[in-house]
From Swiss-Prot:
Name this polypeptide is given: Probable beta-glucosidase btgE
Residues spanning the signal sequence: 1-18
PANTHER family according to UniProt: FAMILY 17 GLUCOSIDASE SCW11-RELATED, GLUCAN 1,3-BETA-GLUCOSIDASE
Alphabetical GO biological process terms: cell wall organization; cellulose catabolic process
GO molecular function, one term: glucan endo-1,3-beta-D-glucosidase activity
GO cellular component, one term: fungal-type cell wall
Highest taxon of source: Eukaryota
Classification lineage: Eukaryota, Fungi, Dikarya, Ascomycota, Pezizomycotina
Family affiliation: Belongs to the glycosyl hydrolase 17 family.
Annotated gene: btgE
Length: 552
C-alpha cells in the first residue's frame, strides 16, 4: 500500500499600516514613526510544492522542526560616560550586621520641611531645632503654583555683561528606586552674548492648576536653626506647604555665586564715558519706625481709561496733586509710558520720593531685564527711596522663588554699579512670604507685601486697619530684623461682596480711614484712579480701586 503526504507552503502577500506615536514630556514634543516595508511594484507571488512518497503501512511521519537561532544586533552610542562605584550592604533580619568601625551618624540639616495636606482644615506643625557645625550646600525645597499649560521654572538665573562661561551649582532630582532624590550638581554653561540666562530650569506641562515642589540649592552655615511651630489654615484639598528654618545665621537661600571665565570676543565695545556723574542715593527706604497714622504713599499708573499712555501734562498735574493730598511717596510699577522721565520730573518739582518698580510679566525675568537697564541709565537716585523688583510675580506664576531671588540679586548689582545705594525688595502677598521667606529674605533689604483686607471674607470695612496691622505683625517674624512695608492696600468702591467684605463708596472711605489710622505711615494706597482697562477679576472689583478723592 502506498500512502502519500503532500505538504504545500504558500507565500502570503500583504500590507501593513503605519502608526505614529505622539509623546510629550516636560514640554518637549517628539514624533516617532513605525512603518512596514512596501513591496516593489514588479514583485510576483510564487509556490513551492514538495512531494514525499513512503512505501509501507500507513503511519505518521514526524517532521523535525529546526530550532530557531537568535541573532541580536545592537548599535550603542555613548552620550555621557559616567563612572560609578556601588557598594551593596546585605543585612540579616535576625542577626544585625556588625562592623569593626562605627558608622558615621547622619547629621540633620535645616532643609525646609515639605508637608502635604490631603484635606482642608487647621493644622499645627511642631517646632524643630537643628545645630549645624560645618558649612554645607544642600537642596532646599520651593513650591510654586502653575496654572494649566506649559511652564518653565527653577534653575539658576544669572546676568552677564560679556560673553562668558559660567560654572555654578544647581539642584535637580534623580531617580532612586521607586522615588526620586534631590541632589546638587555642577554645570558649565556658555553665555554667548551679554544678557540674562537661566541655567538648568525645568519645563513641564500641567492639565490643571497644580502646586509643584522642586529643589533649590542653599548654603547652610554653622549655627542653630529653628523651625518654629506653624499653624496652617488649608482651604483647598491636596495642598503642599513648605515650612522653612530660620536662625541666628540665616542660611543663604540664593544659589552660590557662579564662577566665570571670560570668552575672548572678536570685538571690544568701549564703555561710553560721561562728564556728569549720576547723583548718589542719599535717601533711605521709607521709614518704618512703628508709628501709626498718616498716609505714606499711593500707587500711580500713567494710563488712560482705555489703557493708552497719558500725555506729559496730565502726568505732571496728577502727580503734583498727590503732594497736595499729603502724600510723601508715589509708587510706580514699571518704566513704560516714559514713567521715569515724566513722573520723575513731577516728583522733583513737587518734592515727592519715588518707589520705582521692575515689572515681571508672563515673559518671566528675561523680559524684565530691559527695565533694569533703563532704570540704571536714568539714575536719578536722589528721588528714589526704594526699588521693587517684581509685583506678585510668584503669586501670578510668572517665575518661581529661586528665579526671582537670583534676578533681584543681579538687578541690585546693576543698580549699585550705576550709583544706587538704597534698598531693593520685591512684593508678594503674605502667603508667598510665608512659603518662600527662606529664599527671599537673603536678597531683600526689607519685606514688601501687598495686603488687601477685602479678599478676606471675614473682614468688614471698619476692621480693615486692624487686619492689615495683624498681617504686618506676622510678616515681621519672617525675616527677623527687617522692616515691613505694605506696598499695596485699599478697598474697592464697586463690585460684588465677599462675605463681610462689601464694596462701595462709603465702605471704601471707612476702610481707608481705618488703614490710615492703624498703619498709614507704612502703607501705599491702591490706587490713584480706577483702572478701567483691566479685566473685571474676582468679585468684579479689579477695576474699581481708585481712591484719590477719598483723601482731603
Amino acid at each position: 500500500m502506498r500512502g502519500a503526504i503532500l505538504a504545500t507552503a504558500a507565500a502570503l502577500a500583504g500590507t501593513a499600516m503605519a502608526d505614529v506615536a505622539h509623546m510629550r514630556r516636560h514640554g518637549h514634543d517628539s514624533f516617532h514613526q513605525r512603518r512596514a516595508a512596501v513591496a516593489e511594484a514588479d514583485a510576483t507571488c510564487g509556490c513551492t510544492t514538495e512531494v514525499v512518497t513512503v512505501w509501507g503501512p500507513p503511519t505518521l511521519i514526524p517532521v523535525a522542526t529546526p530550532t530557531p537561532s537568535t541573532v541580536t544586533s545592537e548599535a550603542v552610542t555613548t552620550l555621557h560616560s559616567t563612572s560609578t562605584s556601588t557598594v551593596t550592604i546585605v543585612a540579616s533580619a535576625s542577626t544585625p550586621a556588625t562592623s569593626s568601625s562605627p558608622a558615621t551618624p547622619k547629621v540633620p540639616l535645616p532643609t525646609p520641611a515639605i508637608t502635604n495636606f490631603p484635606s482642608t482644615g487647621v493644622y499645627t506643625i511642631p517646632a524643630t531645632t537643628v545645630t549645624v557645625f560645618d558649612t554645607t550646600t544642600v537642596c532646599g525645597a520651593t513650591t510654586t503654583e502653575l496654572p494649566a499649560g506649559t511652564h518653565t521654572y527653577g534653575g539658576v538665573t544669572t546676568v552677564v555683561e560679556t560673553a562668558t562661561t559660567v560654572v555654578c551649582p544647581y539642584a535637580t532630582v534623580e531617580p532612586s528606586g521607586t522615588t526620586v532624590t534631590s541632589v546638587i550638581k555642577t554645570t558649565t554653561y556658555v553665555c554667548p552674548t551679554p544678557g540674562t540666562y537661566t541655567i538648568a530650569p525645568t519645563t513641564t506641562t500641567v492639565p490643571t492648576s497644580t502646586v509643584v515642589v522642586y529643589p533649590t540649592p542653599a548654603v547652610i552655615t554653622p549655627g542653630t536653626y529653628t523651625q518654629p511651630e506653624q499653624t496652617v489654615t488649608v482651604t483647598r484639598t491636596d495642598y503642599t506647604y513648605v515650612c522653612p528654618f530660620t536662625g541666628q545665621n540665616e542660611p543663604t537661600s540664593a544659589p552660590a555665586a557662579p564662577s566665570t571665565t571670560a570668552v575672548p570676543a572678536t570685538t571690544t565695545a568701549a564703555v561710553p564715558s560721561t562728564s556728569s556723574a549720576a547723583p548718589s542715593s542719599s535717601s533711605t527706604a521709607p521709614a518704618s519706625t512703628g508709628a501709626v497714622g498718616g498716609q505714606m504713599g499711593m500707587t500711580y499708573t500713567p494710563y488712560t481709561k482705555g489703557g493708552d499712555c497719558k500725555d506729559k501734562s496730565s502726568v505732571l498735574s496728577e502727580v503734583a496733586n498727590l503732594k497736595s493730598k499729603g502724600f510723601t511717596h508715589v509708587r510706580v510699577y514699571s518704566t513704560d509710558c516714559n514713567s521715569l522721565e515724566y513722573i520723575g520730573e513731577a516728583a522733583r518739582t513737587s518734592g515727592l520720593q519715588m518707589i520705582i518698580g521692575v515689572f515681571i510679566s508672563s515673559t518671566g525675568v528675561s523680559g524684565a531685564q530691559d527695565q533694569v537697564t533703563a532704570i540704571s541709565k536714568w539714575a536719578q537716585w536722589d528721588l528714589v527711596s526704594l526699588i521693587v523688583v517684581g509685583n506678585e510675580a510668584i503669586q501670578n506664576g510668572y517665575c518661581d522663588a529661586s528665579t526671582l531671588a537670583g534676578f533681584i540679586s543681579s538687578a541690585k548689582s546693576a543698580f549699585q554699579s550705576a550709583g544706587y545705594t538704597g534698598k531693593v525688595t520685591t512684593t508678594e502677598p503674605i502667603n508667598v512670604w510665608q512659603a518662600y521667606g527662606s529664599t527671599l529674605c537673603g536678597v531683600c533689604d526689607i519685606i514688601g507685601a501687598n495686603i488687601h483686607p477685602f479678599f478676606n471674607a471675614d473682614v468688614s470695612a471698619d476692621q480693615a486697619g486692624k487686619f492689615v496691622a495683624q498681617e504686618i505683625k506676622v510678616l515681621e517674624g519672617i525675616c527677623p530684623g527687617k522692616d515691613v512695608l505694605n506696598l499695596e492696600t485699599g478697598w474697592p468702591h464697586a463690585g460684588n461682596a465677599n462675605g463681610k467684605a462689601v464694596p462701595g463708596a462709603s465702605e471704601q472711605a471707612i476702610a481707608i480711614k481705618s488703614i490710615a489710622q492703624e498703619v498709614g505711615s507704612k502703607s501705599v494706597f491702591f490706587s490713584y484712579f480706577d483702572d478701567l482697562w483691566k479685566e473685571p477679576g474676582q468679585f468684579d472689583v479689579e477695576r474699581y480701586w481708585g481712591c484719590i478723592d477719598t483723601f482731603n
